[in-house]
């Protein structure tokens, strides 16, 4: 049986599953939306009986299929027993974001026909919790725009099916917008000198040289970076040794535009020299 890369995209309605599927299609995956979970084994069986150069597949499966929740566990287990390896990506967003998105699109939530929107959202969370618990990756899209979500999903899809190296995501954020869900390590850099209070730097970001110089050249920053890099050098290989596939390192300042962005860039460059699968994103830089 030829080794296939199979990605299952699922999660809460309105959390960005269609955007995620489009991202993988742009990355070269053969994509199917709303495939009944019971048809997945037959689809893969036919694929292995066919001469084809297509080896990467992505499927969106969710509550639009009435029997999805009752069937997915047995189907996924049977596929694993047959030797298939697949990755489940579960997308979610906070309630306020989902409500806003539904208000903007004027679409009906699949579980809100006889209930209010908020009740439908909460019921879906409850129903999908067993699937969320077995997902390989949980992505909170609450504070991601379309381009950021696409980039994140494509980064995941670009990895090899058999990961020999841990995938590390370095993320800058602003504490005023909340700590990123799913972050494994959170570093608060609000103790560093703040460029926000320097008039000529206030409207710049940590991607620009004047801000980077202001933040990174301070003695306290240099001392902090040395200690933080030592900690990461100690922890990351041990996470990998324990079989952890993903590690998210979140660096936060007040607004997520200056200090955290500058420091996250240094952390990214450092880790990129040690691990093959490292990505960098700035959650709140455009706020």
Curated annotation (Swiss-Prot):
One of its GO terms (molecular function) is ATP binding. Keywords: ATP-binding, GTP-binding, Nucleotide-binding. ATP binds at residues 11-18. The keyword Disulfide bond does not apply. GTP binds at residues 62-65. InterPro entries: P-loop_NTPase, RapZ-like, RapZ-like_N, RapZ_C. Pfam families: PapZ_C (PF22740), RapZ-like_N (PF03668). Displays ATPase and GTPase activities. Belongs to the RapZ-like family. This is Nucleotide-binding protein Dalk_1358. It comes from Desulfatibacillum aliphaticivorans.
């Amino acid at each position: 049986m030829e080794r296939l890369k199979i990605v299952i995209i699922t999660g809460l309605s309105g959390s960005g599953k269609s955007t995620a599927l489009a991202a993988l299609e742009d990355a070269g995956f053969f994509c199917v939306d709303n495939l009944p979970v019971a048809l997945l084994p037959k689809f893969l069986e036919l694929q292995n009986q066919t001469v084809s150069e297509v080896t990467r597949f992505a499927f969106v499966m969710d509550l639009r299929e009435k029997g999805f929740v009752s069937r997915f566990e047995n189907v996924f287990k049977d596929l694993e027993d047959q030797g298939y390896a697949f990755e489940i990506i579960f997308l979610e967003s906070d309630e306020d974001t989902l409500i806003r998105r539904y208000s903007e699109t004027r679409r009906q939530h699949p579980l809100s026909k006889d209930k209010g929107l908020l009740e439908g959202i909460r019921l879906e969370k409850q129903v999908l919790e067993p699937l969320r618990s077995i997902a390989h990756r949980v992505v909170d899209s609450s504070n991601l725009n379309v381009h950021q979500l696409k980039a994140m999903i494509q980064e995941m899809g670009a990895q090899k099916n058999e990961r020999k190296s841990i995938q590390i995501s370095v993320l800058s954020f602003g504490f005023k917008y909340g700590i990123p869900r799913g972050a494994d390590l959170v570093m608060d850099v609000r103790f560093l000198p703040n460029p926000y209070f320097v008039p000529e730097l206030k409207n710049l970001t940590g991607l620009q040289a004047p801000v980077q110089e202001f933040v990174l050249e301070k003695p306290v920053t240099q001392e902090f970076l040395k200690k933080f890099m030592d900690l990461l050098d100690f922890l990351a290989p041990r996470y990998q040794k324990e079989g952890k596939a993903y590690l998210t390192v979140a660096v936060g300042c007040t607004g997520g535009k200056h200090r955290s962005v500058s420091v996250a860039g240094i952390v990214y460059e450092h880790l990129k020299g040690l691990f093959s699968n490292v990505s960098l994103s700035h959650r709140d830089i455009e706020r």
